[in-house]
Amino acid sequence: MLKVIYRERIFIDTYQCIEYEKEFKAWSCWQSGGLYYFKVDRFNHKVLAVEDTISIKEV
């Protein structure tokens, strides 16, 4: 099981945004073309850009 911490941005307008750090657990991950793909359960995947991913740790 992996613990993933990532940065989520909510844009208020063209020049301002609010950044949050969020986390989730995933079964596995792989990287392809600047994106991380995380298997979060039997049927679903979550896709994050490499630059938005803060840490991936084995739990």
Please provide the spans of the model-predicted regions.
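Generic structural signal for short, solvent-exposed loop/turn connectors between secondary structure elements
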Residues: 1-2, 59
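A short beta-strand micro-motif
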Residues: 2-10
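Residue-level recognition of conserved beta-strand positions in structured domain cores
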Residues: 6, 40-42, 58
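Boundary regions of SH3-family modules and the immediately adjacent low-complexity/disordered segments
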Residues: 52-59
